[in-house]
Amino acid sequence: MKLERLLAMVVLLISKKQVQAAELAELFEVSVRTIYRDIETINRAGIPIVTSQGSGGGIGIMETYRLEREWLKEEELFAIASALQSVSSMYEPVSHSTAYQKIKHLIPEQSTQAFKHQTEKWFIDMTAWGHTEDQKTLREKISAAIDRLLTISFTYTSASGETLLRETEPYTLVCKAGHWYLYAYCLVRNDFRFFKLNRMKDLAILHQTFIRKDIQLDTLPWDKSWYQKDRLTELVILVQPSARQRIGEWFGYDVLHCCEEDEICQAVISLPEDQWLIGFLLQFGKDIEVLQPLHIRDKVKETIHHMQKIYET
């Protein structure tokens, strides 16, 4: 499209002092005559384009205009490019790739190596191990509904195993701790809710539009639906040396109270008391022991007993 070509041409001219018309024609796969017509269009838009003849000549933006256009420092461009790369590991629309290439073209030639070094300094991949294309397709489908302000329906299974058909007004896709969630207004509960994407099935985009309510994402307590203080239970556990690293990663090493490196440690941790809790504790196997509270200890023992009966048959 002409508009995209004009924008790309301006971005390219911002980063380079002079570009030959033939080079632009080859890059954008149009004729040299078309390039000169585009230059006239850009001039009429208020961006002063000049041409110069001879060796080293070509098409460029007027030097006096250069100071006005330098509104982003190189360090800021590096940061934007790194952020785009990180987002692309989780969500890959064409616009992100195009935006990255445009940012790349803004970097002066003398800073190309510095740009490469800075964008390779960090590599953030928030996708889950063994993630499937189904999850990516689901995210893109929800994103399309958000863009078009269309309600969606899906079958949702909660952590407790309850399955319901939900109809929602989708607001925001949230990636937290490697998992994707949808923040949406639930028309069944008449309130905002979080929905874990891997618990959704049979998602459909409906033809009913909605008016987006004003929300402030930066003030939303993303842990609120799970990590509420009134739902937390304080647990006292014994931790074998083999589990010390994993407990430290989850809760911080300051919760571990040990006398010697090879000794069993005691830890005091706080977690929501729900169906998830017992499964979380059992993942550590024989490497931890719940001391308190007694009702949680009994639930762990009961679950282990049921598991033993299953494997004995």
Swiss-Prot record:
Q: Which residues form the WYL domain?
A: 131-210
Q: Which key words tag this protein in UniProt?
A: Cytoplasm, DNA-binding, Repressor, Transcription, Transcription regulation
Q: Name one GO molecular function term.
A: DNA-binding transcription factor activity
DNA-binding region in chain numbering? 19-38
Highest taxon, organism lineage = Bacteria
- The HTH deoR-type domain is annotated at 2-57
Recorded GO cellular component terms are: cytoplasm
Name the PROSITE patterns for this protein. Answer: HTH_DEOR_2, WYL
Subcellular location field: Cytoplasm
UniProt cross-references to Pfam families, sorted A to Z:
HTH_11 (PF08279), WYL (PF13280)
Q: What is this protein called?
A: Uncharacterized HTH-type transcriptional regulator YobV
Gene source species: Bacillus subtilis (strain 168)
What's the gene? yobV
